[in-house]
Amino acid sequence: MALWRGLRAVLAVAGLAVAVQLLRGWLGSKSYVFNREEIARLAKEHSGLDYEVAFSKIITELRKKHPGRILPDEDLQWVFVNAGGWMGSMCLLHASLTEYVLLFGTAVDTSGHSGRYWAEISDTILSGTFRQWKEGSTKSEIFYPGDTIVHEVGEATSVQWSAGTWMVEYGRGFIPSTLGFALADTIFSTQDFLTLFYTVKVYGKALLLETSTHLSELGFF
């Protein structure tokens, strides 16, 4: 019996290792809709403007360049995010299993843990300040409007945003792997299940839009 349990454990670990390698290969070889430089450049062009004006212009530009990829106005919603001890708000524009684009920020001073992801995440600041303290360092660095901060795969940092900080965020990697961190505080701390519902709903809508657009491009519709 003990031998059988041990064999099952070995097979499970081996299966997981194979799945991880296959996923890494897929992420490394697939084509993507967006890229970090494009999003950073677009956000930087509008940094320094009133952030609501900047948001509107950025959404318009993204819809022109990527038709069918950005959620329609009726599905755009600002949703609270509690994670790693900090509190912010996001407005999801695009999401798939491997990419997302969103607007993010906070109306109050807030700080906490960045999370550690199987995804690369970049933020370009439109207004306010972003202070980052990297793991293994004894000093923090502060970023200003127009700056882009890149959070590498597997990296962990301390983050701090001043009130009125707003930015454009792009993530690339295995996006479902980020949801545990993004939703843990909501489930186990704030127990704000309405926010949880909003988050899952908008991500689901984004996945449906991306699937529909992809199938349309392949000629299914």
Swiss-Prot record:
| Membrane-spanning residues | 5-27
Swiss-Prot/TrEMBL keywords: Cytoplasmic vesicle, Endoplasmic reticulum, Lipid transport, Membrane, Nucleus, Receptor, Transmembrane, Transmembrane helix, Transport
Q: Is this entry keyworded Transmembrane helix? A: yes
Q: Which residues does the UniProt site feature Important for ligand binding point to?
A: 123, 169
**For this UniProt entry, which residues form the secretion signal?**
none
Q: Segment Important for ligand-binding: which positions?
A: 96-103
Q: Which residues lie on this side of the membrane: Cytoplasmic?
A: 28-221
**Gene Ontology biological process terms from the UniProt entry:** lipid transport
* Top-rank taxon, per record: Eukaryota
- According to its record, how does it sit in the membrane? Single-pass membrane protein
Please indicate if the UniProt record lists Endoplasmic reticulum as a keyword: yes
Compartments (UniProt record): Nucleus inner membrane; Nucleus outer membrane; Nucleus envelope; Cytoplasmic vesicle
Lumenal-side segments? 1-4
What GO cellular component entries does it have? cytoplasmic vesicle; endoplasmic reticulum membrane; membrane; nuclear inner membrane; nuclear outer membrane
**Chain positions covered by the region annotation C-terminal hydrophobic region:** 174-221
Q: What else is known?
A: Sigma receptors are classified into two subtypes (Sigma-1 and Sigma-2) based on their different pharmacological profile.
Q: Which family does it belong to?
A: Belongs to the ERG2 family.
Query: Tell me, what does this protein do in biology?
Result: May function in lipid transport from the endoplasmic reticulum and be involved in a wide array of cellular functions probably through regulation of the biogenesis of lipid microdomains at the plasma membrane. May regulate calcium efflux at the endoplasmic reticulum.
Q: What is known of its domains?
A: The C-terminal helices form a flat, hydrophobic surface that is probably tightly associated with the cytosolic surface of the endoplasmic reticulum membrane.
Q: How does it assemble?
A: Homotrimer.
Instruction: Provide the protein name.
Output: Sigma non-opioid intracellular receptor 1
Gene source species: Xenopus tropicalis
